[in-house]
Each structure stands twice: as C-alpha cells, then as structure tokens.
C-alpha cells in the first residue's frame, strides 16, 4: 500500500512521536512504508510522514547504478534495508555540512545542513530485537534526518539561524503551497 506523504504544515510532522510498543504489525507497516518511499524516490521515510505518530522509520542503502545501463527501478538497486524502531543516538563524532531534502518538502534542499559525521544508534528491528549500528557519512546523515522526524524536527531547522531565515524566505511560496496541500489532505482524510 502506498500512503500519501504528509507535507510541511501537517501537525503530525511537528510532534514528538510515541514509542513503538506493539511490534505485531510493524513488518507489514515497514513494507508499506518502503513501497511509499520507493514511489517517491526517497532514501528514508519516517512514520510521521505517513501520518503515524510512532518512533519508526525505514531507510535504504542503494548500490551505484552501473554506467551505461538503462535506468533501473530503485527497488532493484537496494543494497541494504533498515527498519528502525525507537532509535537512540548514543554517540556522535565530528561535524560536517551536507545536502538534504525531504519527501515532506518536495523539491526543497539545503547544501549546508550540519550533522555528526559518525554516530552509534541503538534501536529495535521490526521484530522488537535490540540492535546497535555504527554509521558514518551519508547513512549517518540519513539516520539523523529520520530520527529528527520522530522528534518533530525538519532539516532546515538544523541550519544556523541566518541560513534558516534565508531558506524560509527563499522558499516562502513553496512552503505556503505545502501548507495548503497539507490542510486539504487532512480535510480529505477526515471526510473519508
């Protein structure tokens, strides 16, 4: 099942998500979240982005597409899938700026989002088993971005204040449009 992705302006994106306690439906939910993420051409998707206040996200590592081949569906390029519930970052090292976008802010990016270069994350998998991962570089950035979603934080809020204000000003029209679309979707969902 492909879920509609909640856009900037939807209140669920601004709330701290509740811990996952019942894992009985998480595997199926994660499959649907992955399908939704692939449809949107993303690398990660947090439960609040589909309207669920749960501390859960999915993320994938993609293999590089071989040169000269026809473009393949993203699903065929997956190297590793992560299903992450109740994550806690227990260690951070280094600080690097990098480019980020978000499926809840489609088409908007910032090249200067500061994140830890290396992290250690403790979490539970789709069956509730405890796991520990050490990540660096791009996947460390993806995990930090998705964990922020679980805390009601959007990527541009990580920018230093002057850059954040410049981002908001430069993208004002798009942000207003997202807010209108978010309200329309909420209205549609409440009537359906």
Curated annotation (Swiss-Prot):
GO terms for molecular function: metal ion binding; peptide deformylase activity. InterPro entries: Peptide_deformylase, Peptide_deformylase_sf. Keywords: Hydrolase, Iron, Metal-binding, Protein biosynthesis. Fe cation binds at residues 102, 145, 149. Binds 1 Fe(2+) ion. It holds the Pfam family Pep_deformylase. It is an enzyme of class 3 (hydrolase). Its cofactor is Fe(2+). Its EC number is 3.5.1.88. The active site is at 146. Gene3D superfamilies: Peptide deformylase. GO terms for biological process: co-translational protein modification; translation. It catalyses: N-terminal N-formyl-L-methionyl-[peptide] + H2O = N-terminal L-methionyl-[peptide] + formate. HAMAP family: Pep_deformylase (MF_00163). Belongs to the polypeptide deformylase family. Removes the formyl group from the N-terminal Met of newly synthesized proteins. Requires at least a dipeptide for an efficient rate of reaction. N-terminal L-methionine is a prerequisite for activity but the enzyme has broad specificity at other positions. This is Peptide deformylase. The lineage of its organism: Bacteria, Thermotogati, Deinococcota, Deinococci, Thermales.
